[in-house]
């Protein structure tokens, strides 16, 4: 029979329920010892009758507990955990008391194993006192400190576990803390915060505990016939006496041990009123009377302290395994009884008032309690233990029918029944067969199915079956989603070997929601149907109620309730006839027993109480109405009708007022919208989205297509320029030194390795020597060049590094410009970008799409209003727009600061899209001009208008000529005519150059062209600037090196000359001192008359003007013209004069003179085809006369007469001026540079050409070694070197590839005044300045006389440049 107290018990193996001895009195017939061994206890099928404690009146149990041979009392009901076993006599074993009143829901924590959770629960129950639900901090700290962890670690564990921050731990929090302790003990790191899964499980567990309300005994006893007995506990209470009898019977058992047990008192049965929900069933002892109940006897007091543990049984027999029975339930009928079987089967549960004392019967503790959950009942050893929850309260009283079995299990499970006594077939084989890795034949599974036990397979799913089905589900649900897809389920069910129609029917029944996948409950239903089919049972057409999952049932009930409420309403529900469904513990309600009766009277009308009285109000439906009553009713109806009419009129008036009010509000809103539109039109903010998109597309095409390409091209040009510079220098060096191999740096290294190979040590030594030479040269002021190729390699290396650095600098400038363009792009894009919301709003509110007809009509009206107002504003502002355009054009032509300020002032007043476009362009132009201004760049149109300085320089030019010949003073009538063309022609050229540049306007095409022109201008500027700097560096370095070499050579030659020359040299320079003394006077006199111009130079001026007009074309827009004028134009340099006067000197003869003097050739070096000595390769050398004068001056003895004291000073002055003139001519490619400084006009430079003969005397002072015929020659030779300080310029270097004209001559003479002249002297004769052509003949005579000199030595190429010895050790900048 099914016992409601046994539904929490797991099945056990057949156990003996007691021991029968020979001397046991025979009351009711009882089964023998051997028969007892075969008893199977546990859950029975419903057809078995339940033996109950309460027997009928015709059957009175008569069991005597006074004799020794009485059956041992068995534990019934939920027991406390007590140690069992044999205890020594007289000594009580220590006990651990659990708090059985603690309510802990049966919830499984996934991160803790089931075994650990049981241990933690046991520890928690022993640590929590009664009446509490949580363990306090002190008790928890005592337990946690036993782990041996540090306090810091325990503090972290506590902070993680105490989720509610209450200072105490509920069971899930306590279990979490112990789990974290075990993790820390294993060496695993503690998490910084709880994983989300853990936290959710713990919080759900805590909520379940918090929501659970302890059951109140008064509520349980309410509305039951036992409520009146809740407070009675008299001496004649048979349950109390029975408890004492039980203890005495245990004490006087045949074991002779003292008291039977010290069990904690447990409430068993229904009499005591205490709930059985939280009790836990355990191994039970046999009931007091197995086959009969005896009358209560006098209790026997125990003679000694109760034993803490005791095993059932006695003597030398094998002790029984602990058997678990229900509370206060007699032994189950497990076989035929030799007594009154029919009477026992017909026993009904009743109430015996004398059995109340059984309420206090103590139960024992078995140490195998935890293992009991693993024991199986009957023949099934594979059943898993099911966690049990609180028992449902049963109605008590005299019940003629036996109690029905109640479902138990974890929350979310349904209708589980216990495994039948005989077991069910093939369940174990099914578990092994359906696992994923199992590959067993189907015949093995089908052979174990069926048989005699197939009748035990019920519709309901047993606990064991459910556990097996869940295990199979978890094995196949690898993704842990809680679902199994159709294809996976097909693989699982196909293992059964069933036919396809059967599997389709099973799937249809299981997949109730038709989702194509099964959850855990639906999978269990499908597996149970498969199991039934394998046992030969038919598949039902509809799912039976026992197999409907609780989740589906609850959902369906809720849906039915909702449908009923929606269909009939809540008020139409009959509460009196409604069925109150009994809710079980699986729903975890706070108090499931408190349903609270609600009377249906609350839905009745309050006036129903007076309905039965006499009616005082007449109605038209009454049959006994008089005439007066009818008249009265008519008046009342008229009054009601009038009231209704008045209400209707008021409603109509109110509606009209409200409608008019709404119309007024709408008109007001329309006027406000029009005002806003007018404001937008006046400010130019009403541009449509299409225009913004168009402008944004143009911006993207410029910034994402054109600008990146231009920048990449600029970078490429920079790299090409750097490489070209290096290659150009390499070509020049190779031209000067044909034997130099730039690819081989080891030509000068002497190898010490095998076969003369150069080793790494040799290279390091060579580098160290070269470095030492360079340092010594830097300290002593001497050159480190020893005639080897190392200097050439070093120069090439330095030039390569300079080219790279310049390329990097230019790239940085380009990057700055790129960043400024990016800023402009971002600023414009923020104003032009539109969002999806704006686009959708534009479709709706600008085109009237997707809105009501009235609103669409207003939108169209607003568009027409905006268009008309836009035209009016455009007409009104047309003149102002033109004026603003003109003003903006004028302001753009101003410097960058004024240009940048103009768009800001105009940006606040643009009103039309055209004005806005002009504003955006002005903003971009402003930012670009600011960036260019920071870089020192100004636009071409700005430079054209804002550059009025060159004409003033040309006008001021006649005031600064350093010298003028006295002979040409009479021919000075034409200077005003000659001065006027130079300022006019450059200006006209500039105007012509500006014509291709477009004027400033508001069109986007012009903006694009302007932007492209700016970028082109910037690129040209960078390229020319790089070339200029590179040429300057190269020339400066070459000049320094060669000057140092010349100083060394001069010193060496002076030493040799002093040792070799005779002391009888003739002082042929005596007459020249008078000439040199007279030169300053001529200079001073010429300075006083600046307007004088030579007549001879007139034709030369007219030929030079076109060249100089063509030259500035490439650099009219150069913003650096003013800046370059200062560094490049050394106004104090008297040497920069036009080179056209060099035509009076034969360069071939001068070259032959130098070669003969230095002994470069065996045929005396007078060849006309010496390419290595061309003047183009020596840009820093002066003319032939200058070289001869320097040579003669350097060979003169240091201290022979007093005159050489003036010669070094003059030579120093000349060399300084020469260095300055060379520095001004450092950029030969400036003629085609857009941004180079425009050259001055030719006439201003030609005017200073005549003073060539004025400084004839000072140069030939150093010519004593010349033979006797030499003295007249120096008087004629100096015209050329004299022009050096005032008008001579070095020969121009090779022009760049696209030379538009001759190299520009810096405007140095227009700067500071020339240096102060020496003391004045008598003016030279006129013939000295006019007879320039005879100079070549005199030089030829001089060269013919020099041919006889054999003392001159032939030098190498590195020593071919000489200079004054006064410049030794000085650094020229």
From Swiss-Prot:
Protein name: Actin cytoskeleton-regulatory complex protein PAN1
Main location: membrane
Coiled-coil annotated residue ranges, if any: 1007-1066
Subunit structure, interactors included: Component of the PAN1 actin cytoskeleton-regulatory complex.
Biased composition (Pro residues): 1250-1326
Lineage: Eukaryota, Fungi, Dikarya, Ascomycota, Saccharomycotina
Superkingdom per UniProt: Eukaryota
GO biological process: endocytosis; endosomal transport
Function, in words: Component of the PAN1 actin cytoskeleton-regulatory complex required for the internalization of endosomes during actin-coupled endocytosis. The complex links the site of endocytosis to the cell membrane-associated actin cytoskeleton. Mediates uptake of external molecules and vacuolar degradation of plasma membrane proteins. Plays a role in the proper organization of the cell membrane-associated actin cytoskeleton and promotes its destabilization.
Low complexity bias: start-end ranges: 290-309, 341-362, 878-909, 965-977
Cellular localisation: Cell membrane; Endosome membrane; Cytoplasm, Cytoskeleton, Actin patch
PANTHER family, A to Z: ACTIN CYTOSKELETON-REGULATORY COMPLEX PROTEIN PAN1, EH DOMAIN
Entry similarity comment: Belongs to the PAN1 family.
GO cellular component, one term: endosome membrane
CDD domains in alphabetical order: EH, WH2
């Amino acid at each position: 029979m099914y016992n409601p107290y046994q539904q929490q018990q797991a099945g056990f193996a057949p156990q003996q329920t007691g021991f029968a001895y020979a001397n046991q009195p025979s009351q009711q017939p009882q089964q023998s010892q051997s028969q007892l061994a075969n008893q199977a206890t546990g859950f029975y099928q419903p057809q078995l009758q339940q033996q109950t404690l309460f027997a009928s009146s015709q059957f009175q149990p008569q069991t005597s507990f006074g004799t020794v041979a009485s059956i041992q009392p068995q534990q019934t009901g939920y027991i406390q955990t007590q140690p069992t076993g044999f205890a020594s006599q007289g000594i009580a074993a220590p006990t651990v008391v659990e708090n059985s009143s603690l309510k802990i829901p049966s919830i499984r924590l996934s991160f803790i194993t089931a075994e650990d959770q049981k241990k933690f629960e046991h520890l928690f129950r022993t640590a929590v006192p009664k009446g509490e639900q949580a363990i306090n901090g002190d008790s928890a700290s005592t337990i946690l400190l036993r782990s041996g962890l540090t306090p810091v670690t325990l503090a972290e564990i506590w902070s993680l576990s105490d989720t509610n921050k209450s200072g105490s731990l509920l069971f899930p929090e306590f279990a979490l803390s112990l789990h974290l302790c075990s993790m820390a003990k294993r060496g695993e790191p503690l998490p910084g915060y709880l994983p989300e899964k853990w936290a959710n499980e713990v919080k759900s567990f805590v909520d379940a505990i918090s929501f659970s309300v302890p059951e109140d005994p008064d509520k349980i006893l309410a509305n039951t016939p036992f409520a009146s007995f809740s407070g009675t506990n008299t001496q004649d209470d048979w349950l109390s006496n029975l408890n004492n009898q039980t203890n005495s019977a245990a004490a006087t058992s045949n074991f002779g041990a003292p008291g039977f047990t010290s069990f904690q008192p447990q409430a068993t049965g229904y009499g005591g009123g205490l709930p059985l929900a939280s009790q836990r069933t355990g191994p039970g002892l046999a009931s007091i009377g197995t086959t009969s109940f005896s009358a209560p006897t006098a209790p026997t007091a125990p003679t000694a302290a109760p034993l803490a543990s005791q095993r059932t049984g006695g003597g030398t027999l094998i002790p029984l395994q602990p058997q678990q029975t229900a509370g206060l339930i007699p032994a189950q009928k497990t076989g035929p009884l030799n007594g009154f079987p029919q009477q026992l089967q017909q026993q009904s549960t009743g109430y015996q008032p004398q059995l109340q004392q059984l309420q206090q019967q103590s139960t024992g503790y078995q140490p195998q309690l935890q293992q009991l959950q693993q024991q199986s009942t009957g023949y099934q050893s594979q059943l898993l233990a099911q966690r049990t929850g609180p028992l449902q309260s049963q109605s008590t009283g005299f019940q003629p029918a036996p109690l029905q079995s109640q479902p138990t299990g974890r929350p979310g499970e349904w209708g589980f029944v216990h495994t039948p006594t005989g077991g069910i077939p093939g369940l174990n084989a099914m578990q092994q067969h359906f696992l994923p890795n199992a590959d067993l034949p189907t015949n093995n599974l089908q052979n174990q199915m069926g048989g005699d036990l197939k009748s035990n397979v019920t519709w309901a799913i047993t606990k064991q079956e459910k556990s097996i089905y869940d295990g199979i589900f978890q094995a196949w649900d690898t993704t842990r989603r809680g679902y199994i897809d159709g294809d996976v389920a097909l693989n699982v069910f196909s293992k059964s070997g069933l036919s396809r129609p059967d599997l389709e029917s099973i799937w249809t029944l299981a997949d109730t929601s038709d989702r194509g996948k099964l959850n855990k409950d639906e999978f269990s239903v499908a597996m149970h149907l498969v199991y039934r089919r394998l046992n030969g049972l038919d598949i039902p057409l509809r799912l039976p109620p026992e197999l409907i999952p609780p989740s589906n049932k609850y959902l369906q009930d809720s849906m039915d309730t909702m449908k009923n409420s929606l269909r009939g309403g809540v008020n139409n529900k009959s509460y009196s006839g409604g069925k109150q469904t009994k809710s079980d513990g699986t729903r975890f309600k706070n108090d499931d027993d408190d349903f609270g009766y609600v009377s249906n009277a609350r839905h009745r009308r309050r006036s129903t109480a007076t309905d039965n009285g006499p009616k005082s109000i007449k109605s038209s439906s009454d049959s006994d109405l008089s005439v007066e009553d009818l008249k009265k009713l008519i008046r009342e109806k008229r009054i009601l009708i009038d009231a209704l009419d008045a209400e209707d009129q008021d409603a109509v008036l109110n509606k009209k007022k409200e409608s008019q009010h709404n119309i007024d509000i709408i008109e007001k809103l329309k006027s406000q919208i029009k005002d806003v539109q007018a404001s937008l039109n006046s400010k130019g903010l009403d541009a449509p989205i299409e225009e913004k998109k168009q402008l944004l597309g143009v911006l993207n095409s410029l910034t994402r297509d054109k600008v990146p390409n231009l920048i990449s091209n600029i970078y490429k040009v920079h790299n090409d320029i750097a490489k070209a510079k290096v290659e150009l220098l390499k070509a020049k060096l190779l031209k000067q030194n044909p034997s130099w191999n730039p690819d081989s740096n080891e030509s000068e290294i002497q190898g010490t390795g095998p076969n003369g190979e150069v080793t790494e040590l040799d290279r390091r030594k060579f580098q160290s020597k070269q470095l030492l030479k360079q340092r010594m040269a830097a300290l002593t002021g001497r050159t480190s060049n020893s005639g080897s190729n190392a200097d050439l390699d070093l120069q090439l290396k330095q030039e390569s590094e300079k080219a790279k650095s310049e390329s990097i600098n230019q790239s940085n400038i380009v990057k700055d410009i790129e960043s400024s363009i990016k800023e402009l792009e971002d600023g414009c894009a923020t104003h032009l970008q539109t969002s999806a919301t704006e686009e959708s709003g534009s479709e709706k509110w600008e085109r009237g799409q997707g809105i009501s007809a009235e609103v669409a009509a207003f939108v169209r009206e607003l568009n027409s209003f905006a268009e008309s107002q836009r035209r009016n504003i455009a007409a009104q502002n047309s003149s102002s727009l033109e004026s603003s355009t003109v003003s903006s054009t004028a302001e753009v032509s101003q410097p960058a600061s004024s240009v940048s300020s103009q768009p800001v002032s105009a940006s606040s007043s643009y009103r039309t899209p055209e004005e806005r476009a002009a504003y955006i362009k002005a903003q971009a132009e402003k930012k670009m001009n600011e960036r260019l201004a920071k870089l020192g760049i100004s636009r071409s149109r700005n430079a054209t208008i804002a550059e009025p300085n060159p004409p003033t320089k040309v006008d001021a030019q006649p005031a600064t000529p350093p010298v003028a010949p006295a002979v040409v003073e009479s021919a000075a009538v034409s200077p005003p005519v000659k001065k006027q063309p130079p300022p006019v022609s450059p200006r006209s050229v500039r105007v012509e150059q500006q014509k291709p540049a477009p004027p400033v306007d508001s069109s986007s095409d012009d903006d694009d062209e302007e932007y492209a022109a700016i970028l082109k201008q910037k690129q040209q500027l960078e390229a020319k600037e790089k070339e200029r700097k590179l040429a300057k560096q190269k020339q400066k370095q070459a000049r320094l090196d060669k000057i140092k070499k010349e100083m060394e050579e001069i010193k060496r030659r002076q030493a040799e000359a002093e040792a070799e020359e005779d002391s009888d040299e003739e002082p042929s320079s005596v007459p020249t001192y008078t000439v040199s003394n007279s030169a300053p006077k001529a200079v001073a006199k010429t300075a006083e008359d600046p307007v004088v111009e030579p007549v001879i130079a007139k034709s030369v001026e007219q030929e030079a003007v076109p060249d100089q007009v063509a030259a500035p074309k490439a650099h009219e827009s150069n913003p650096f013209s003013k800046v370059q004028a200062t560094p490049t134009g050394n106004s104090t340099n008297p040497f920069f004069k036009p080179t056209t006067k060099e035509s009076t000197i034969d360069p071939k003869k001068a070259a032959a003179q130098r070669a003969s003097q230095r002994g470069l050739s065996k045929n005396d070096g007078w060849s006309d085809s010496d390419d290595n000595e061309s003047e183009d390769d020596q840009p820093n050398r002066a003319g032939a006369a200058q070289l001869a004068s320097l040579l003669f001056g350097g060979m003169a003895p240091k201290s022979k007469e007093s005159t050489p004291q003036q010669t070094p000073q003059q030579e120093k002055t000349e060399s300084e001026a020469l260095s300055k003139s060379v520095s001004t001519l450092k950029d030969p490619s400036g003629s085609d540079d857009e941004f180079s400084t425009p050259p001055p006009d030719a006439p201003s430079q030609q005017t200073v050409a005549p003073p060539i003969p004025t400084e004839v005397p000072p140069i030939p002072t150093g010519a004593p070694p010349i033979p006797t015929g030499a003295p007249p020659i120096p008087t004629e030779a100096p015209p050329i070197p004299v022009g050096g300080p005032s008008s001579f310029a070095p020969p121009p270097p090779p022009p760049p590839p696209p030379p538009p004209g001759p190299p520009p001559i810096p405007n140095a003479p227009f700067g500071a005044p020339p240096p102060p002249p020496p003391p004045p002297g008598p003016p030279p004769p006129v013939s000295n300045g006019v007879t320039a052509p005879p100079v070549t003949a005199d030089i030829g005579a001089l060269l013919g006389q020099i041919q006889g000199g054999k003392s001159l030595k032939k030098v190498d190429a590195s020593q071919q440049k000489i200079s004054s010895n006064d410049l030794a050790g000085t650094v020229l900048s």
